[in-house]
Amino acid sequence: MGFTSFMKRDHSVDNSDLEQVIVPSINSEEKNTSTDGSNVDEKIIYRYDTVTADDDLYAIESAIETKLSWFNRLATYLNAETKGIEPVGEDERNPDESVVNASSMWFSANMVIAAYALGGLGPMIYQLNFGTSVLVIIFFNILGLLPVAYFSIFGCELGLRQMVLSRFLLGNLTARIFALINVVACVGWGVVNTVVSAQLLNMVNHTSGHEMPLWAGFIIARLAKSHKFSNGEWTSGPTTAGNVLSFGCAVYGFATGWTTYAADYTVYMPKNTNKYKIFFSLVAGLSFPLFFCMILGAASAMGAVNDPTWNQYYQKNSMGGLTYAILVPDSLHGFGQFCCVLLAMSTVANNVPNMYTIALSAQAMWGSFAKIPRVIWTLAGNAATIAIAIPACYYFEGFMQNFMDSIGYYLAIYTAIALSEHFIYRKNSFNNYNIEDWNDNSKLPIGIAGTAAFIVAAFGVALGMCQTYWVGEISRLIGKFGGDIGFELGASWAFITYNIIRPFEIKYFGR
């Protein structure tokens, strides 16, 4: 039957009345071998055999009924991963899986035009000069990427996806709240990436009368020679400090945005992989593209500040228009347009992790959602991304700034709670995690402390945030335009609240 095979036991040995039926499976007990040597997961079902032809026919019909849905059959045919949020056992790991794979994946995901566009916000939105923008980019990127590298170690050690791991770190209830937020974040990142690519594609061939409409769209080689780049004036004072904090919040949000994805991409590494090697390889893989792209974006923006023509392109199509101005007119012309298309396509590398993790996060929200194949969640996530990206194209600057800051807020809270649990209550030891409890509500931490910390931290964020739609009472005290300290207040309030309540949760509930 293609996907089904049968083996009859010798009736001269014990348990000879058992018949073994092998069918592909993504649930229950699995083993990664197949009778034809393919990579199909198989489930063994034992049935009593009366050695009659009728029973053989019944076994065949029963096995056919247990075959995979057509989605998973297709995924199996394409050699795609179909495993859900269940822990990845040591026997399922890939002995050839290298830290270079994870490091290069994050390198590709961040060497994209969205990071470049974010760097341009420093001079264009926050009125910072190039030197100040570079310092902010380096410091806040380091602050944001360290949790990503650190939580990647957990995936290799425990074999748990990040949102399932969160049940141990945040508590069961809190983890499901963050799983929902993570689904929203996956779509949001996809929108941000798609928007800036659409803006760039919109500029290609725009002088020929055949420009690509904005909704359908879904590097500086000559700055020094053109004399359009300058460092800008060094300024100080409360207003500059406020702008530094606000730009830093956006940078931090971009860098740390992968924190709730981290363990998803190391679960197939052998457990004995050197943990220091994982950490520092990922730090390198994350830091270089983030530094390079954002600093390049800041330099490009400084050129727009000094050149009226470039500024006009920027005003028309934001960073996409500015990139076109640098690469095409009076520069590389046709080849420059080709480069613009390549840059726009870099979005694919950034969106792959989003659409991979969105399915795992959706399944982690609720048990019933785990029964829906991952491919369905991924398709739904892509559809939502397109639907939101189209209107967001026309309001990119405000959307990107607000979204990045919002991501930074909730991830700072997540990191503060998770690190508290691991270092204080689990004594920085992986031996204090019982992986078998991953889906047992009676044994997992309830999440009282985590939920309380999240709620209290939200008030801290509200007091410290500085957005076009809301300026907190504390943030408005910093400079003329306010300074965003929402993620700092959120993290600190979450840490304090969690460590006040968590001991009582352990004392009275024992978990």
Language-model features: locations:
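Hydrophobic, membrane-embedded alpha-helices of multi-pass small-molecule transporters
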Residues: 99-116, 220-224, 234-303, 330-355, ...
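TM-loop-TM module centered on a large, flexible mid-protein loop between adjacent transmembrane helices
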Residues: 296-350, 368, 389-397, 401-405
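Membrane-interface "cap" regions at the ends of multi-pass membrane proteins
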Residues: 3-130, 221-225, 243-249, 267-277
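Transmembrane helix-loop boundary segments of multi-pass membrane transporters
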Residues: 123-135, 204-216, 335-339, 369-380, ...
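C-terminal membrane-solvent junction of multi-pass transporters and transport-like membrane proteins
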Residues: 415-496
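Hydrophobic transmembrane alpha-helices that form the core helical bundles
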Residues: 175-210, 344, 348-364
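Transmembrane helix-boundary motif of multi-pass solute transporters/channels
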Residues: 70-170, 174, 260-269, 273-287, ...
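Loop-to-transmembrane helix boundary motifs in multi-pass membrane proteins
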Residues: 213-216, 348, 364-397, 439-461
